[in-house]
Amino acid sequence: MEYRLDNYTRSPQFLLDRLAANCKARRLEKGYSRRTLSDLTGIPAPTIERFERTGKISLESFCQIAILFDYFDEVAALLNHTKYSTSKELETINRNQNRKNGR
């Protein structure tokens, strides 16, 4: 397999690492310790430490942190609009736009 930078930068782990690094940066900008962030969000301090180290955290806990740092609108806007890469994919999206379930 040919190595390309995209193999890493477009991976789930890359996103997790970026989100964790960004959250840690916001925490430090606010002057919060992990304990303070824990007290403000109800997320255990060891969970926050693991998140900052590995990027692993529940979506609910991530949302609590995002809300505390006033990123509610940005998180709510994720996946908010349709993306497509081919005209056939766009046709499928348009055909399925009003579907309520997968069948």
Model regions and ranges:
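A short, Lys/Arg-rich alpha-helix, primarily the initiator
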Residues: 2-28
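Residues in the recognition helix of alpha-helical DNA-binding motifs
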Residues: 26, 40, 51, 78
